[in-house]
């Protein structure tokens, strides 16, 4: 079927927030008022439409980003639900990559919270235009002005209210629309579906005038004509104000602030109007960049049906009815079912079996999709998160890849029976395909299966999925830290491998210079061979030997990182040399670093932020110091104190329960991986003794 909406009428947006700011409730209300949900799902009773994995319904947090299509005022909305829990920032990054705009939801009582900052910074990285919805204005202690202030202070963003609340806490009646200078008041009986315009209450008139002037002054700055008219005393029309606010959102000049209470059904329709009026369509954002598959030159793809097809797979989910679903954003061109595609990231062929339009948990089969659409494809075999799909015959392209953070925490899993062993293998490969920040490996020595993730909650949920969805019974080890190793000295190692016992022998000599690298540089290999001391075809053998040797460590079997190896000299034999011989030689040379390279143990250091009421400050800081934490600074946020610290991950296990106990459940914390650092000698000796 032909296109039903012009691409200019699309709004691909996500809703981002701190955990518990009311993001899922806001999404639910949007689906309810746009007519896509027949009953309102409440997170409190575990019934929200978007949160459709059992684990999410129980924990009341959103884990997977489900994509949903809805309609409002003749525009087509594709809503991507993003998780707000810090263990799932990978999901947030992934959904930000495919969004054109976002609504940031704040809790009117708390303002900007730690995870708000995290997702805001990620949105800055991808230059996502945003509007802000201050939610929960019906809550005790909700304070709109303070929330707006927190956006300025904590995010350093220019916040310009375009609405004000009427009443607060339980007396919240509606909002003042500063663009139209009208009060919008909701009828409490009709589940928020009925509302009407009224005159602005007398006691708020002055405040509204001042807020409107501030809004207009900031808006007209973006348009010379409007600015001139305003300076000569002419009041801008509603149309001009909207045009200027839209420009501000697209350029990031300022962020419009709206307010309401999704739970009490107030303020959601004006929020939808703002999404339509101010957030970008696919043609308002810069063309997406990519690399030509054949020439490797940079190319651009405009959001148009006439351009060659380019599609980004941003999420893979296992669906109980359809099997594996790959959520995709079509950046350009037209996609049809039955089409043969090329996965240009992996140079593999794919065929589109079924194409579905998702409404959080119902699905609609479609035959065609166009630039700007977000669809789920069934039946793809080779595609992983972050891969590009395109037309093999029309200038295939690789869109920019997404970068995923290192998993820093691991647990061992042992299946309880032979039958579980088989189920475990299948389940884990599916989970790893769905989530690039979750990796599965086998410990060569113990034969155990090792799962690595971003945090305790991340791994808990994976284990939960194994047990519930895949019915795997397994014994779970205690969480372990993903230590790493490195070297501290520059050293030259000359190693000759020869094995000549009649018949074809083996011979290879390598001279390698090893030196410590910058933190985060990983492993760098370079060949500085001149004059053919080691023929070109054997150099990959040297690199391969080092690649495999570094995985087994020097001290305690942890991968070696942040070093450079340069092949400077060597020797070969016409008959006895081979790629394998050079691989064995470089592997043996690497092992000598144990004695000569000053090996050291590294541990992951987490950036921890604790928000605690003043009275527990002493105990919290004392406790962090006891965990080898380095306090980086503290701030006031309302009447709470915010402590920032670097703490080794090894000392953060079970911290959530400790902190609760210490603060009677009133303090919270978030942590993100920051960097690797050398482990103090005393601690290192214990770790090496345990693992070596």
Swiss-Prot record:
Q: Which GO terms describe its molecular function?
A: GTP binding; GTPase activity; translation elongation factor activity
Can you say where in the cell this protein is located? Cytoplasm
Note the SS bond partners.
none
The record's comment on protein family reads: Belongs to the TRAFAC class translation factor GTPase superfamily. Classic translation factor GTPase family. EF-G/EF-2 subfamily.
Under the heading PANTHER family, the entry gives: RIBOSOME-RELEASING FACTOR 2, MITOCHONDRIAL, TRANSLATION ELONGATION FACTOR G-RELATED
Listed CDD domains: EF-G, EFG_III, EFG_mtEFG1_IV, EFG_mtEFG_C, EFG_mtEFG_II
Its biological purpose is as follows:
Catalyzes the GTP-dependent ribosomal translocation step during translation elongation. During this step, the ribosome changes from the pre-translocational (PRE) to the post-translocational (POST) state as the newly formed A-site-bound peptidyl-tRNA and P-site-bound deacylated tRNA move to the P and E sites, respectively. Catalyzes the coordinated movement of the two tRNA molecules, the mRNA and conformational changes in the ribosome.
Sorted alphabetically, the Gene Ontology BP terms of this entry are: ribosome disassembly
Protein keywords: Cytoplasm, Elongation factor, GTP-binding, Nucleotide-binding, Protein biosynthesis
GO CC annotation: cytoplasm
Q: Which SUPFAM superfamilies match?
A: EF-G C-terminal domain-like, P-loop containing nucleoside triphosphate hydrolases, Ribosomal protein S5 domain 2-like, Translation proteins
Q: Which domain of life is it from?
A: Bacteria
The organism's taxonomic lineage, starting at the top: Bacteria, Pseudomonadati, Pseudomonadota, Alphaproteobacteria, Caulobacterales
What Pfam families has UniProt attached to this entry? EF-G_D2 (PF22042), EFG_C (PF00679), EFG_III (PF14492), EFG_IV (PF03764), GTP_EFTU (PF00009)
Q: What name does the UniProt record give this protein?
A: Elongation factor G
Q: Which residues form the tr-type G domain?
A: 8-283
Q: Which PROSITE patterns match?
A: G_TR_1, G_TR_2
Where GTP binds, per the record, is at 17-24, 81-85, 135-138
């Amino acid at each position: 079927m032909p296109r039903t909406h012009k691409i200019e009428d699309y709004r691909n947006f996500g809703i981002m927030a701190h955990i518990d700011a009311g993001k899922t409730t806001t999404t639910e209300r949007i689906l309810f008022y746009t007519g896509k949900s027949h009953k309102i799902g409440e997170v409190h009773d575990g019934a929200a439409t978007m949160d459709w994995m059992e684990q999410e319904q129980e924990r009341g947090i959103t884990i997977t980003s489900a994509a949903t299509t809805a309609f409002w005022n003749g525009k087509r909305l594709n809503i991507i639900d993003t998780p707000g829990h810090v263990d799932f920032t990978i999901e947030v990054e992934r959904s930000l990559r495919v969004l054109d705009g976002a609504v940031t939801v704040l809790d009117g009582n708390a303002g900007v919270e730690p995870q708000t900052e995290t997702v805001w910074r990620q949105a800055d990285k991808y230059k996502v235009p945003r509007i802000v919805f201050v939610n929960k204005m019906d809550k005790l202690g909700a304070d709109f002005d303070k929330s707006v202030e927190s956006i300025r202070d904590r995010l350093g963003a220019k916040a310009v209210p375009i609405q004000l609340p009427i009443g607060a806490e339980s007396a919240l009646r509606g909002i003042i629309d500063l663009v139209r200078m009208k009060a919008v008041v909701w009828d409490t009986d009709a589940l928020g579906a009925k509302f009407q315009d009224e005159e602005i209450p007398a006691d708020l008139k002055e405040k509204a005038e001042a807020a409107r002037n501030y809004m207009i002054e900031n808006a007209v700055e973006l348009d010379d004509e409007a600015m001139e008219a305003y300076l000569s005393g002419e009041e801008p029309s509603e149309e001009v104000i909207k045009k200027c606010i839209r420009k501000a959102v697209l350029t990031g000049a300022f962020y419009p602030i709206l307010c309401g209470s999704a739970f009490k059904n107030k303020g959601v329709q004006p929020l939808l109007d703002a999404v339509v009026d101010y957030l970008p369509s696919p043609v308002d954002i810069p063309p997406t960049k990519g690399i030509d598959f054949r020439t490797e030159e940079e190319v651009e793809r405009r959001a148009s049906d006439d351009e060659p097809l380019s599609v980004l797979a941003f999420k893979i989910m296992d669906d109980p009815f359809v099997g594996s679903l790959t959520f995709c954003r079509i950046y350009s061109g037209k996609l049809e079912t039955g089409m043969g595609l090329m996965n240009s990231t992996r140079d593999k062929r794919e065929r589109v079996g079924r194409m579905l339009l998702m409404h959080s948990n119902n699905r609609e089969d479609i035959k065609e999709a166009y630039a700007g659409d977000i669809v789920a494809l069934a039946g793809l075999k080779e595609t992983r998160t972050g891969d590009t799909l395109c037309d093999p015959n029309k200038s295939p392209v690789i869109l920019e890849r997404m970068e995923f953070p290192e998993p820093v925490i691991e647990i061992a899993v042992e299946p309880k029976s032979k039958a579980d062993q088989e189920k475990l293998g299948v389940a884990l490969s599916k989970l790893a395909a769905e989530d690039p920040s979750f990796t599965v490996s086998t410990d060569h020595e113990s034969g155990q299966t090792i799962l690595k993730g971003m945090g305790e909650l991340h791994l808990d949920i994976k284990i939960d999925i194994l047990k519930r969805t895949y019915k795997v019974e397994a014994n779970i080890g205690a969480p372990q830290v993903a230590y790493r190793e490195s070297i501290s000295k520059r050293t030259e190692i000359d190693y000759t491998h020869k094995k000549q016992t009649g018949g074809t022998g083996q011979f290879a000599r390598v001279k390698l210079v090893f030196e410590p690298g910058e933190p985060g540089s990983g492993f760098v290999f370079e060949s500085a061979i001149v004059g053919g001391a080691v023929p070109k075809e054997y150099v990959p053998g040297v690199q391969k030997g080092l690649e495999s040797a570094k995985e087994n460590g020097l001290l305690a079997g942890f991968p070696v990182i942040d070093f450079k190896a340069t092949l400077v000299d060597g020797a070969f034999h016409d008959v006895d040399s081979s790629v394998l011989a050079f691989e064995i030689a470089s592997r043996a040379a690497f092992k000598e670093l144990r004695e000569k390279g000053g090996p050291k143990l590294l541990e992951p250091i987490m950036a921890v932020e604790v928000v605690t009421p003043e009275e527990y400050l002493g105990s919290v800081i004392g406790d962090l110091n006891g965990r080898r934490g380095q306090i980086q600074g503290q701030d006031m946020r309302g009447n709470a104190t915010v402590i920032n610290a670097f703490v080794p991950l090894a000392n953060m296990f079970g911290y959530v329960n400790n902190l609760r106990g210490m603060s009677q459940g009133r303090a919270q914390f978030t942590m993100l991986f920051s960097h690797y650092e050398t482990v103090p000698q005393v601690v290192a000796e214990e770790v090496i003794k345990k693992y070596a």
